[in-house]
Amino acid sequence: MKNIKIKTAIFYADKQEQVNLELLGAKFIKNVSVLDLNFPVYEYKNIYFFYIHSQIGLINSAIFSQTVAVKFLITNIINYGACGGRSSIDFSKMKNQLIFPKRFYLLDAKTPWYQPGQLPFEPKFYENNLLATQNFNLGSSNSFIFEENQVKDFQFVDFFDMEAFSFAQISAKNSLNFYCIKYLSDKIGQNLDILEVNSNIKQGAQSAAKYALALLEKI
């Protein structure tokens, strides 16, 4: 693969979301260094890609995705991972479904002059998920959302996580193709037991990772 251009990076934030890609048909090629950490390069059906554990939080996601974008000149960012749902979401119905959000908001952005979720002088939201087939809004925060009071100003947001907004923003600012795949692990005010949440994260990661690998052949 010496002269092969790697154009895609698959990012996940929580270590519980990591999947053994070799069991899904991918082949480990080598490790690369990103911010003094080693991450694998895999090959799947003759397509090479980076598999990056960005770690939890908006800042980590932004740092790792920007570094990978600049260092390796990728053109595609795929982010898969767990998210929480509003209390109005039917958790049992949606638990095993993949979610493809349409808009991304920053839950930590609140000012007297802009609508909730908008950074000053930045777009109101990002709408660049090339997989978006559902009219869902996702909000990202450095806080885990577990109470309705935390998002009382965001009644228009359906799902919550701690990284997708950063991936959407970095993709937009670097003119990268962005693909976001989410799935439910919890719901505001319910099923907050850490063991149950982690179990849901691990279970959902399998189908999300399979989808991400299949996507490689189409982008």
Place the predicted regions along the sequence by residue.
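A short acidic-Thr-Gly-centered motif at the start of a beta-strand
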Residues: 1-3, 151-152
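Extreme N-terminal starter segment of soluble prokaryotic enzymes
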Residues: 2-9, 47
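N-terminal beta1-alpha1 ligand-phosphate binding loop
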Residues: 7-33
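Glycine-rich phosphate- or other oxyanion-binding loops that anchor nucleotides, phosphorylated ligands
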Residues: 34-219
